[in-house]
Amino acid sequence: RPSFCNLPVKPGPCNGFFSAFYYSQKKNKCHSFTYGGCKGNANRFSTIEECRRTCVG
């Protein structure tokens, strides 16, 4: 799994309202969160399938 999968969820400082997914290392699963639309980090996926394929295996 790529190292960015272990980054904490980071919604970013902007006020957008975008549905996204992140990988939780603690639970070894992908969860939804609301992304603000800017900044954040690489542990952010458009679909749960993409998150699972990249980080869960």
Curated annotation (Swiss-Prot):
Subcellular location: Secreted
Family membership noted in the UniProt record: Belongs to the venom Kunitz-type family.
Cited InterPro entries: Kunitz_BPTI, Kunitz_BPTI_sf, Prtase_inh_Kunz-CS, TFPI/VKTCI-like
UniProt free text on domains: Exploits its two major loops and engages more positions in its interaction with V2R. The pharmacophore defined by numerous amino acids positioned in loop 1 (9 to 18) and loop 2 (34, 39 and 44) may be at the origin of the absolute selectivity of this protein for V2R.
Protein name: Mambaquaretin-3
GO MF annotation terms: serine-type endopeptidase inhibitor activity; toxin activity
Organism expressing this protein natively: Dendroaspis polylepis polylepis
One annotated Gene Ontology cellular component of this protein: extracellular space
BPTI/Kunitz inhibitor domain ranges (all copies): 5-55
Record key words, sorted: Disulfide bond, G-protein coupled receptor impairing toxin, Secreted, Toxin
Disulfide bonds: 5-55, 14-38, 30-51
Entry keyword annotation includes Cell membrane: no
Xref: Pfam families: Kunitz_BPTI
Tissue localization of expression: Expressed by the venom gland.
Function text: Interacts with vasopressin V2 receptor (V2R/AVPR2), probably in a selective manner. Inhibits vasopressin binding human V2R in the nanomolar range (Ki=13.3 nM), and also moderately inhibits vasopressin-induced cAMP production (IC(50)=453 nM). In vivo, intraperitoneal injection of this protein into rats increases diuresis by 4.5-fold, without any loss of electrolytes.
Keyword Secreted attached: yes
